[in-house]
């Protein structure tokens, strides 16, 4: 994707594919209104700056995930770039967290901006080494692939004072047992299930 210019990316329709393919069956299940479906058509890919500005406008809290880059961009100064944008836009620190599978980047953020909240991602690709490594507890807060843990382990870890969030968690049964076990946050493709259970973003 590094061969695309920003202008080319901004020309794309980033929403119609969802309406046309219904990848998770949510349209067929009647969980998305026609008004929302109509709003998907012609959606544009936002820049990081545009996303932060919208987050500020709507008073949301956002997870800024620093994505591992392809080989052609391995020397891109990811941490410096995002920190500069945060400062330039006067983004309040209580409105965002910074997360990444690249734990070296998170350590760099900690060093340069210790007041920022960070969350270490674990579990992609789904290798056994990841299942072992995250338990070294280099960080206070983790987001772990649900496939790599159990409610019993979450209960044990949170009782030790660590914050554990889960991703790749999409069933109501999992929501219930992991919330009861003490998970701090849920990252899911089905927030409407959580809303129906009385939880909110």
Model-based region annotation:
Residues 1-117, 137-138, 160:
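Metal-dependent phosphodiesterase/phospholipase catalytic core, i.e.
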Residues 119-201:
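C-terminal active-site rim and adjoining tail of enzyme catalytic domains
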């Amino acid at each position: 994707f590094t061969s695309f210019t920003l202008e080319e990316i901004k020309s794309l329709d980033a929403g119609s594919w969802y309406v046309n393919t219904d990848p998770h069956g949510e349209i067929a299940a009647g969980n998305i209104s026609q008004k929302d479906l109509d709003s998907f058509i012609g959606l544009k890919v936002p820049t990081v700056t545009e996303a932060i500005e919208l987050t500020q406008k709507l008073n949301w809290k956002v997870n800024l995930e620093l994505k591992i880059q392809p080989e052609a961009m391995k020397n891109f100064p990811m941490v410096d770039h995002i920190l500069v944008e945060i400062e330039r836009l006067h983004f309040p620190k209580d409105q965002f967290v910074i997360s990444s599978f690249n734990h070296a980047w998170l350590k760099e953020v900690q060093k340069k901006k210790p007041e920022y909240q960070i969350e270490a991602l674990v579990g992609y690709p789904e290798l056994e080494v990841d299942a072992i490594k995250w338990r070294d507890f280099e960080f206070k807060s983790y987001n772990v692939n649900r496939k790599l843990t159990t409610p019993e382990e979450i209960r044990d870890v949170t009782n030790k004072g660590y914050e554990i969030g889960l991703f790749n968690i999409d069933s109501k049964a999992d929501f219930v047992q992991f919330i009861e076990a003490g998970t701090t946050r849920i990252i899911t493709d089905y927030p409407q299930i959580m809303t129906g259970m009385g939880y909110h973003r």
